[in-house]
């Protein structure tokens, strides 16, 4: 899962959106640095990552990547799940339009920005103003996201080529998304994530 899915599942679970978004920027035990609700959100994010990586649908999808891109498949798939969530948002969350949800999420996250790591602050400078969560629905933007990550982290250069794996297996990936994401939504609503 990437930014949109973590925020969405956090909302459904009535968990801290701030903590769920911040989690990838926090190493080790967050309890000394953040308030309890944010810490709970960080822990939820980490549980979701482990759960998602071990889903049979996701493990199967990783196998569809070529040898040269399989190492970055987990990252590529996380971004792709956000694509499908953004694309099908009106079906999955009909009572909370994506643009409104994005504004709501931004308001929640802004409350912790002053005490956040610099890399997280930098992300927020772009995430909201460039409307990433809404733009995830466009595959051209997904390609741009993957290229951007590859540019910032040379060891992840294979992300550029992983675009072709997404394109080649688009329909099958979408099917897998529909197989697991509604289950995760239900688990989040029961606070079981």
Curated annotation (Swiss-Prot):
Q: What is its EC number?
A: 3.1.4.14
**Reactions accelerated catalytically:** holo-[ACP] + H2O = apo-[ACP] + (R)-4'-phosphopantetheine + H(+)
**Keyword Lipid metabolism annotated:** yes
- UniProt keywords, alphabetically: Fatty acid biosynthesis, Fatty acid metabolism, Hydrolase, Lipid biosynthesis, Lipid metabolism
Example of a GO MF term: [acyl-carrier-protein] phosphodiesterase activity
Membrane in keyword set: no
- The cysteines covalently paired via disulfide bonds are none
Q: Which InterPro entries does this one have?
A: ACP_PD (IPR007431), ACP_phosphodiesterase_gpbac (IPR023491)
Top-rank EC class of the record's enzyme: hydrolase
Query: What GO terms describe the biological role, i.e. biological process, of this protein?
Result: fatty acid biosynthetic process
Q: What does this protein do?
A: Converts holo-ACP to apo-ACP by hydrolytic cleavage of the phosphopantetheine prosthetic group from ACP.
Q: Which family does it belong to?
A: Belongs to the AcpH family.
Write down what this protein is called: Acyl carrier protein phosphodiesterase
Gene assigned in the entry: acpH
